[in-house]
């Protein structure tokens, strides 16, 4: 497969997200905009929860995951944290710069690394 470690899978996923943000202005606005539209924010949070669930399943499909906390959606939170980095880049530069794209990936991976050991056995 295209990856042998969870770190590589995490980078692959974030790169796909970045490709969507960069190719689709509407997606970028919806996900990254600093708007006060609470219902849009709610929808976005719901979207993050669903994506978090999908991401957990994707990681679980490829690796033997440790038991994850029941009270925190680690994968959804990792995405929200990296989204904040991308939003900051859009705020400052009106685009997600390569440097900030890299920082977002690092934030995503670093947060997951608090819950996933450095090495996970593949399925």
Name these PLM-found stretches.
Residues 1-22:
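Hydrophobic alpha-helical connector segments
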């Amino acid at each position: 497969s295209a990856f042998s470690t969870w770190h590589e899978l995490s980078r692959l996923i974030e790169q796909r997200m970045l490709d969507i943000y960069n190719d689709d202005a509407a997606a970028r606005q919806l996900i990254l905009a600093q708007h006060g539209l609470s219902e849009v924010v709610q929808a976005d949070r719901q979207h993050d929860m669903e994506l978090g669930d999908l991401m957990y399943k994707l990681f679980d499909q490829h690796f033997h995951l440790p038991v994850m906390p029941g009270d925190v959606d680690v994968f959804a939170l990792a995405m929200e944290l990296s989204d904040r980095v991308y939003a900051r880049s859009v705020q400052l530069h009106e685009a997600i710069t390569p440097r900030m794209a890299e920082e977002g990936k690092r934030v995503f991976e670093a947060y997951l690394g608090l819950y996933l050991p450095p090495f996970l056995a593949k399925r």
